Amino acid sequence: MCIRDRYNRNRPYDDLVPEHIAAYFNADMYITTQSPYNLMGTGGNFMSDGMGTGFSSKLILDENSGGYAWNGPSGNVFYPNHTLSEIEDIMQDFMGIQTYILMETLPYDGIHHIDMHMKLLDEETILMAEYPPGVADGPQIEANLQYVLSNYNSAFGTAYKVVRIPSPPSVSGNYPNTNGYYRTYTNSVFVNNTVLVPFYRQEYDTIAQRIYEEALPGYNIVGIDVDNSGVNLIAYSGAIHCITHSVGANEPLLIQHQSLEDTPPLSSYTVLANIQHTSGVNTAQVYYTTDLATGFSPPITMTNT
């Protein structure tokens, strides 16, 4: 299934990409370009936990507040005009979002996309960018993080866990508030058990790789240079997530499982998981380990309840 809304810039060919992808994979196509479901938005400013919670900056409000947007090939283009309640209804109808968390935009992020400073690692864990105290968008990021933690819980009803990752400066030490590019390690993409992470310079990249590996044990963390002088992707205010958002699957397997915390080795405990597939699920097994270097346990067959 593909969902297409309208991009918030005059890029008509970009707007048609979802339709070509849907045709190539023979997938259903849902388009939010006609009233009352017309919605303007950007993939970099939307994340979902897959369980009904979505995140965006308040850019989504500006993009759908009415008024002149730009002059297109067929004449003037206007922003859709929606209230917050109407936007929430569209997000629920097309994206399955029941809780829509909106955060303030950042003053030094020119595109106001949340993927430039945060990443959902799982349903309970937020990877959040970090600046030195008082630098660039650091104060607003901290305020946004406290807003989320104070007002929302994860889909499992637990407080969000937070992993911090430093945002690197330029070679000369500049951050976005002093004309440095918006370098970020949160603009990453999951591809099965691999995570593609934007890289810049070794002295900072090694720290980012360690943080990802500790937060996502068992995943293969692959860095991609986006700050190369020959092909400087980050200079265009984006990195890997900005140009991909996600890599879908034609027949996805959904496994939702809350992590088990503080499990004493001599105690028994219950493992719960929601497992879904288009063809159904006949059996499921649990493999566990306390040390990836020693491998996994023999399989334990789960009971369908």
Model-derived segments and spans:
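Glycan-association/targeting regions that enable binding to alpha-glucans and other polysaccharides
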Residues: V247-T305
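The feature marks the mature, well-folded catalytic cores of soluble enzymes
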Residues: R4-L253
